[in-house]
A protein has these predicted regions:
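Short, solvent-exposed turn/loop segments enriched in Gly/Ser/Thr/Pro and often Arg
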Residues: 26, 134-142
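Amphipathic alpha-helical interaction segments
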Residues: 141-144, 150
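Extracellular glycoside hydrolase catalytic/binding regions
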Residues: 1-131, 148-153, 157, 162-164
Length: 168
C-alpha cells in the first residue's frame, strides 16, 4: 500500500480534489477480494489506503466464467455475477467505502445473458456503494472477440441489448 498511498498523497499535495480509483491486487477480482493467494487479502490491505480528501473508490473486475478471468464463453450460472459481487459489496457497506466495477463481461448465450442481466440488476440495487461499471471490451481492434460490443458493419452486438436498459 506504500506506493498507492504515496501516489494519493502526491495527488492531494498538488491540490487535486478529484476522485481517485484504487485497484486491488491480483487482477482486483471481486470474487477474490478476501483471498490471500498473493499475500494480504484486498479486504484487509485496502483498509490501509489513506486519502486526506476521503475521495477514493475501490475498483474490482468480475467475469462470469469458471476462472473469473473472462477466458471463455461459458458462464457458471445465471446468478454468478451477483454471487461474486456480494462479498465485495458487503465489504464496501461494512467499511463505509465506495466501489466501481472496472471490467465485466459475458458472452452471447442464454446462461451468460441471464448472468449479465442479473449482475447489472445487482449493481443497480447496490448503487448506494457501487458508483459505476465498465463493460469489457469495445473498439475496432477487437474484431470478433466474444465480449466486444463494437458494432459490426453498423449493427449493434447482442450484448448491447442487455446493457442498454442500464445506461443513463
Amino acid at each position: 500500500m506504500g506506493a498507492a498511498n504515496a501516489a494519493i498523497a502526491a495527488i492531494r499535495t498538488a491540490k487535486a480534489a478529484n476522485t481517485i480509483i484504487v485497484p486491488g491486487n491480483a487482477w482486483t477480482g471481486a470474487h477474490s477480494w478476501y483471498a490471500t493467494d498473493y499475500g494480504t487479502a484486498n479486504a484487509v490491505a485496502m483498509l490501509n489506503i489513506t486519502d486526506p480528501a476521503n475521495n477514493t473508490i475501490f475498483e474490482v473486475h468480475q467475469y462470469l466464467d469458471a476462472s473469473s478471468g473472462g477466458e471463455g464463453a461459458g458462464c457458471v450460472s445465471a446468478k454468478i455475477g451477483s454471487a461474486r459481487l456480494a462479498p465485495f459489496v458487503k465489504w464496501l457497506r461494512d467499511n463505509g467505502k465506495k466501489g466501481f466495477v472496472g471490467e465485466f463481461a459475458g458472452a452471447d448465450n442464454a446462461t451468460c445473458n441471464a448472468a449479465v442481466t442479473d449482475m447489472l440488476q445487482y449493481m443497480m440495487a447496490s448503487s448506494d456503494v457501487l458508483v459505476g461499471w465498465l463493460w469489457w471490451a469495445a473498439g475496432p481492434m477487437w474484431n470478433d472477440y466474444i465480449f466486444t460490443i463494437e458494432p459490426k458493419n453498423g449493427v449493434a452486438r447482442p450484448q448491447m441489448a442487455l446493457l442498454k436498459p442500464f445506461l443513463f
